[in-house]
């Protein structure tokens, strides 16, 4: 699968953001709203056989499916407060999408924006994305604020655009590099639930940023050779 929402907003004297996010947060086309949360990750296999095994393990994982469904329910609730009653629909659940370095489970939820509601109203109501807060949303954000000692900066926010024609498209700011003051930062993480295993969650976080880190290592080595 291709990145549905990747961007490089550009650089200025303060730095630059390079975003390769595979996750769509909110899209508005006319009155149709679309959100596509990701929950469930496995790395790509070293060969075709192992890759198929990892795909199957992800698709059959009750834990990953439960996490994904939890976020689907959260986002349906977020959309429901501004969208037409009865229009919020889970079009696809747990769809396997494969990228260069990982496999993901992706669900697709659509709705019809209610009369008098704008894309900006929708973004204000749904931000931050439920796939990176967890549920219950408000309490989860309070706990995150209590436990995390540092700001997430751009990580887990959103990058997007508003068109003069009323369209909007935004992502969840993951798989992203922040370049400032001669430093490059990237972040990786995963959802924590009752049956999470620390080692597996840590490995999932590493898998998500593996391609970014390896690319940076290659660029560093290439730069050193050219010097």
PLM feature spans:
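Extended alpha-helical targeting/anchoring segments
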Residues: 1-227
């Amino acid at each position: 699968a291709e990145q549905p929402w990747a961007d490089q907003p550009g650089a200025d004297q303060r730095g630059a953001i390079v975003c390769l996010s595979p996750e769509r947060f909110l899209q508005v086309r006319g009155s149709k709203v679309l959100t596509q949360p990701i929950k469930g990750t496995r790395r790509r296999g070293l060969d075709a056989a192992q890759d198929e095994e990892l795909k199957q393990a992800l698709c059959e994982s009750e834990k990953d499916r439960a996490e994904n469904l939890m976020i689907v329910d959260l986002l349906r609730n977020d959309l429901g407060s501004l969208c037409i009653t009865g229009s919020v629909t889970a079009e696809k659940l747990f769809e396997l999408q494969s990228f260069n370095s990982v496999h993901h489970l992706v669900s697709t939820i659509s709705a019809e924006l209610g009369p008098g509601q704008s894309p900006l109203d929708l973004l204000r109501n749904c931000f931050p994305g439920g796939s990176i807060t967890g549920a219950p949303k408000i309490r989860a954000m309070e706990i995150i604020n209590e436990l995390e000692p540092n700001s997430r900066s751009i990580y887990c926010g959103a990058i997007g655009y508003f068109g003069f024609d009323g369209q909007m498209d935004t992502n969840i700011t993951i798989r992203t590099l922040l370049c400032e003051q001669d430093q490059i930062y990237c972040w990786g993480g995963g959802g924590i639930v009752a049956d999470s295993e620390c080692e597996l969650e840590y490995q999932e976080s590493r898998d998500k940023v593996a391609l970014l880190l390896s690319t940076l290592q290659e660029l560093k080595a290439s730069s050193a050779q050219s010097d």
